[in-house]
Amino acid sequence: SVNPGTSDTKPDVKPDGKQDATIETKPDESTVETSKVEITVSGDKKAEASVTITKDAQGNVTSANATVSGSKGTLTADVVKQLIEAAGTEDLTIIVQVKNANGDVKYTVSVSAKNVKHNKSLKAFVVNRKTGEYELINSKTYKAEDGNLNVSFGKKGDYVLLTTKEAARIEKEILKTIAPKKAKATVKKGKTTEFKLDSKLNQNNVKKVTYKTSKKSIATVNKNGKIKANRKGTVKIKAIVTLKNGKTKTVSMKIVVR
């Protein structure tokens, strides 16, 4: 018979600061333990935290997550220390839920406890809720000072803070998606065409695109990428794509006017 899973509640669990631990046993004998952790955040009386630890049947920790909710996007060194102790590992993902006065979540920020504790330089991405893709938002670098991290975002969303090394890998892949839809087009004199970028490029990553022509007498291009053929000849139209992280890439399209 299949074990349907069990759960029980333990009162105070010391000395790691965990309280009201709920343990769920899965059919494969793995366990999921969720506990409250008492935290104090200056100027935020409603701040609260919990830790969820998943262990395999042998008792090895396979994942550890903590949720901190309150009115500020602040992680203090003391809170991070408490959460690491409660989880029993530095390999802990902390999800900060920033709420408004009504208690509704404005945005969330996910960050590795290890990266905060060791004051790593971090870059922010927003997670696309439909695709799960990481999208660029700005060129800023965030860094904890003495293990204290303070971040805030104006727009609603799910944000993630990654090390600059991890971010560089994602940014490199995004740069690769910048390409023209067509490398060459033939247009009759007096007619128009358009410089379109490849659909692989997620427009949410783009800050702006500017266009240039190598010979205005042969063809002109406007700010929206619309190309007008003026007289016979060959011309190169360039698109300079600036991403939200400030990085740029120039791609071109060959236009033959007949």
Predicted regions and their residues:
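Exposed beta-strand face motif in extracellular beta-rich ectodomains
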Residues: 120, 157, 233-237
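Short, surface-exposed beta-strand/turn "edge" patches of beta-sheet domains
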Residues: 131-155
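Feature for mature exported/ectodomain regions
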Residues: 1-123, 130, 162-172
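Exposed aromatic-hydrophobic patches
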Residues: 108-113, 148-154, 224-226
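Extracytoplasmic soluble-region selector
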Residues: 169-258
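Surface-exposed loop/edge segments in extracytoplasmic proteins
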Residues: 93-94, 131-139, 217-220
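Conserved aromatic beta-strand anchor motif in extracellular beta-sandwich/beta-rich domains
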Residues: 126-128, 213
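C-terminal beta-strand-rich structural cap/linker in extracellular carbohydrate-active enzymes
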Residues: 148-170
